[in-house]
């Protein structure tokens, strides 16, 4: 109320829950994530373990499996065979895929410059006003930048990986995220693969700076310092040959840029990876999430399983069941297995410690 005229203030503008005219603190009426009066975001102090709805505003929230368990008491649901059919179907609110290109020097070929393709998945409702975690997914041998997103695989039904991300986000089984899919090949017809050193350089020099400059991520800019400061919000994964890149380029060489790691049906010199992450300049960098998995009948099962065990055993920053997880899936070396493992991994990736939610 105005002290001069005695009239009630209409509270036209609030900042941080306080009226800028009369100083009245908003009483808050939180609904679906925001206060209906001052538009302040709900603090989400807790959510129901079954409905996943915030106990204050009613908004459905993804679990945050920090140390393998959400603060609400829920634990992740892992599948070990093909997912329920609904996750492979088109989603009512699909994300979009943007096809981009970038110029890159091939350091192993005298810095020859080539133009490369890059696919970027944006979740439904993507907004420049929000910040998003970023997951780089790398294809396997003979595949390309489309395999993790839009390429169709026949499993008696059309299996398109993008549908899994769309449906998980729609059902609040994972937080909305940006997925970046580059190609390891530097020539036509799946030729001229530059190896993990070249991909590590591309991620550091070009891909991550490009994503940070063109999309709404937690990195304030594409500078190396800003990317390093936001590393907890960047992850890298891959299947088959892509798993070698995820661990070799990502964990072994670019640990200062990535903190979440996903490895399916492959591994890259685990002792060398362990030695690199324990180096003096890397030993204090947290690794909040590491997931690996393979099919029971996959020829890469042994490399995947034992490689995971070696890396976990060689560092005190990884504890199986808390921030390191391995799953065997009923199947072989194919996208049926990888579709299950990406579901298992995405519900846990980018863990955030939250009180009561």
What feature does the model see in each segment?
Residues 77-357:
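Non-catalytic cap/lid and distal C-terminal segments of serine-dependent acyl enzymes
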């Amino acid at each position: 109320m105005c002290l001069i005229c005695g009239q009630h203030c209409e509270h036209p503008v609030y900042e941080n829950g306080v009226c800028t005219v009369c100083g009245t603190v908003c009483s808050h009426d939180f609904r679906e994530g925001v206060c209906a009066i001052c538009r302040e975001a709900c603090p989400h102090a807790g959510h129901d373990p079954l409905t996943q709805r915030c106990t204050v505003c009613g908004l459905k929230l993804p679990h945050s499996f920090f140390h393998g368990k959400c603060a609400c008491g829920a634990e992740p649901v892992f599948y070990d065979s093909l997912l329920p059919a609904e996750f492979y179907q088109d989603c009512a609110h699909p994300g979009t895929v943007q096809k981009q290109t970038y110029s890159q020097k091939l350091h192993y070929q005298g810095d020859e410059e080539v133009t490369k393709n890059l696919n970027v998945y944006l979740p439904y409702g993507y907004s420049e006003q929000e910040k998003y975690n970023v997951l780089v997914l790398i294809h396997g041998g003979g595949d390309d930048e489309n395999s993790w997103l839009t390429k169709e695989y026949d499993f008696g039904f059309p299996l398109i990986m993008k549908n899994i991300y769309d449906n998980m986000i729609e059902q609040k089984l994972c937080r909305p995220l940006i997925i970046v899919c580059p190609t390891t090949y530097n020539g036509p017809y799946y030729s001229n693969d530059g190896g993990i050193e070249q991909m590590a350089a591309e991620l550091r020099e070009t891909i991550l700076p490009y994503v940070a400059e063109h999309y709404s991520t937690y990195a304030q800019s594409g500078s190396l310092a800003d990317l390093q400061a936001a590393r907890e919000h960047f992850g890298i994964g891959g299947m088959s040959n892509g798993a070698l890149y995820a661990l070799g380029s990502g964990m072994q060489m670019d640990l200062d840029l990535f903190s979440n790691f996903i490895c399916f049906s492959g591994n890259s010199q685990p002792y060398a990876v362990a030695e690199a992450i324990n180096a003096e300049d890397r030993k204090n960098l947290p690794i909040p999430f590491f997931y690996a998995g393979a099919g029971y009948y996959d020829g890469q099962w042994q490399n995947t399983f034992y490689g995971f065990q070696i890396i976990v055993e060689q560092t005190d920053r990884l504890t199986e069941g808390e921030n390191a997880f391995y799953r065997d899936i009923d199947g072989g070396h194919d996208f049926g297995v990888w579709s299950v493992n990406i579901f298992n991994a995405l519900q846990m990736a980018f863990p955030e410690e939250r009180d009561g939610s």
